[in-house]
Amino acid sequence: MPGPIPKPLKARELETWLSQNADLTLVDVREKQELAIAPFPHPVKHLPLSEAQNWMGTLNQLLPPAGPVVVLCHAGIRSWNFGCWLLEQQPAREVWNLEGGIDAWSVTVDPAVPRY
């Protein structure tokens, strides 16, 4: 039986939430070199999946205890996987996945963010 999955979120919807100062936590699961190429233009918690062994045990301290979490990566696949895992760990949490990742953000919201 499949577990819980993150809710899909389009880049324009996230832009609206951010412009309204929504109380949410942005989690970027891309690698450091990806952030250097195309940084997200808002503060994020950087939790690269390749370093999960370094932060997994302290996840409860790294994320606020409540409130929505929006997860992003390059194309929305790694973030979706992380979102599924997070919902298994914290079933009561509201988790959203940025559909199309930073690439969709660049195409539909902010072309100043480089595509790679």
Identify what each model region corresponds to.
Residues 1-25, 32-68, 77-116:
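Rhodanese-like catalytic fold shared by cysteine-dependent sulfurtransferases
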Residues 72:
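Short, surface-exposed ligand- or partner-binding patches at beta-edge/loop junctions that are enriched
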